[in-house]
Curated annotation (Swiss-Prot):
Entry's Gene Ontology molecular function annotations: ribonuclease III activity; RNA binding
Domain of life: Viruses
KW Hydrolase (keyword) present: yes
Cysteines engaged in disulfide bonds, as pairs: none
Annotated keywords: Endonuclease, Hydrolase, Nuclease, RNA-binding
UniProt record similarity statement: Belongs to the IIV-6 142R family.
Classification via PROSITE patterns: DS_RBD, RNASE_3_2
Segments forming domain DRBM: 204-276
Species annotation: Invertebrate iridescent virus 6
Reaction(s) catalysed (UniProt annotation): Endonucleolytic cleavage to 5'-phosphomonoester
Protein name: Putative ribonuclease 3
GO biological process: RNA processing
Catalytic class of the enzyme: hydrolase
InterPro entries given in the database record: dsRBD_dom (IPR014720), RNase_III_dom (IPR000999), RNase_III_sf (IPR036389)
Length: 292
């Protein structure tokens, strides 16, 4: 057994389930924004073959993988998020709200957010990828597959509508029908999310930490990140070097499978330390206060 573990090849491929459960998963997602009578058109063997590609990483298959659909889906998902935020929060429909919507887009189109949505839709067990990818790149895989699913769905619908038009002798193109469907699915998903317009919820901890350092540098002094990677885990420590002192103070420690996640956690704890021990608090910028 030990020899098997030692000789295990992480480049080997995990093949996601492509049986009835895969079809049920596709149907369940489509039903969030599509009438049941039309779903069978997207669960034909040909369509499921497209979804198979949309759930396959490049590491698993360098020729038939989700990269094209992920690129298409990335554009559509980002467009949806901006439009959705203006519809959900009409008070942001003005020049002062543009920056807030930009922050909303960064947060809700982020790897963390999209991978959580992907997991909530039970996509993980259906993703075909190398064992190395599934072990060390879970978040990127989930994010890419989420975007790829919507890119593939939009592509399938537009292609289906175009084929019907051509058979009827209509050479017009009907771009946008597919987006309308995925817009409905995404709206259902995002309506379930409790979205806050508070500055501390919109702007990541590392950015807020950097801002407070810039504003209070004369009091806080210099700051340094010390990062370490060991046994598949990143550890980040943040130290401050107070002015006119030879001492250094540990402000926060963070860990994560990704370096930026470790730094984000460390920055969050550093903000807490500055507030609790030194009464240094990062105030929300005026452009955010109007919407909080």
């Amino acid at each position: 057994m030990e020899n098997n573990i030692e000789n295990f090849d992480p480049s080997l491929v995990y093949f996601g389930d492509r049986g009835q459960d895969f079809k049920k998963m596709i149907r369940s997602i489509l039903s969030l924004g599509m009438s049941d009578e039309y779903i069978p058109y997207l669960t034909t063997p040909e369509s499921l073959n497209t979804y198979n590609t949309a759930f396959t990483s490049r590491g698993a298959d360098d020729k038939n993988n989700y990269e094209m659909f992920e690129q298409l889906g990335d554009v559509s998902v980002n467009k949806f998020i901006v439009n959705y935020m203006y519809k959900r929060f009409p008070q942001l429909r003005n020049p002062n709200g543009v920056d807030v919507v930009a922050k909303l887009k960064i947060k809700y189109a982020s790897k963390n957010q999209l991978q959580m949505l992907s997991e909530s839709l039970d996509m993980w067990r259906f993703i075909t990828a190398t064992y190395d990818e599934r072990t060390n790149k879970k978040k990127p895989l989930l994010e890419d597959t989420f975007e790829s699913f919507f890119g593939a769905t939009e592509w399938l619908i537009d292609s289906f509508i175009e084929d019907i038009a051509l058979k009827q002798g209509n050479n017009n193109t009907y771009v946008g029908v597919g987006y309308n469907i995925i817009n409905g699915i995404l709206t259902t998903l995002f309506d379930r999310i409790n979205i806050s317009l508070k500055y501390e919820n919109l702007v990541d901890a590392k950015t807020r930490f950097n801002e407070v350092i810039a504003e209070q540098k004369s009091i806080i002094g210099d700051v340094k990140y010390e990062d370490e990677y060991k046994n598949g885990k990143h550890t980040s420590k943040i130290y401050r070097y107070p002015p006119n002192s030879n001492l250094k103070e540990l402000l926060g420690i963070g860990t994560g499978t990704l370096k930026r996640d470790a730094q984000e956690q460390a920055a969050s704890r550093a903000l807490e330390t500055l507030a609790l021990k030194h009464n240094i608090i990062k105030e929300a910028p005026d452009r955010f206060k109007a919407f909080m």
